[in-house]
Amino acid sequence: MGNMMHRGKGSFTHVENTVFFDHALSLKAKGIYCQIRSLENNPEWVFTIRGFATLVKDGVDAVTAGLKELESAGYIIRARRRSENGRFLKAEEATWITLDDPAMYANVAAELKEEGYAILSDFKRDPATNVEFELENDFPSGGTDG
């Protein structure tokens, strides 16, 4: 069986393995999640779907579909504050929170609600369906093709 190796410059993004081994997510959604995580600590970057779509080849529709997939799976919470008159603030002022594991969703959403946010994400997955994995058990016994 061949080995995988990496040589790089040292700049990296930490991503929990849970998202990679979630068989319910498409590669598109996993890629979008990782790209977002790579940008999170850039204080000058303001997340908008259109702005994010300029960074990738797939375009606004594909990004929107991938984000909806991540939201419904519980890896992203989209939240927005309301103004004093009850209207939502501009889309540019929305808050997007990435989660390492969908099991965190309920607690984080509750914290956001306490802070005055409205939760806009449509989380459809039962957290009990999230599968804990062991790395050695996630691969076929004969290794991988390739």
Predicted regions and their residues:
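N-terminal leader segment of winged-helix/HTH proteins
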Residues: M1-G10
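Compositionally biased, low-complexity repeat tracts
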Residues: H6, L27, A62, R82, ...
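Small/flexible residues
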Residues: K9, R80-S83, L89, P127, ...
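Winged helix-turn-helix DNA-binding recognition segment
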Residues: V19-K30, Q35-E93
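Charged low-complexity intrinsically disordered patches
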Residues: T95-G146
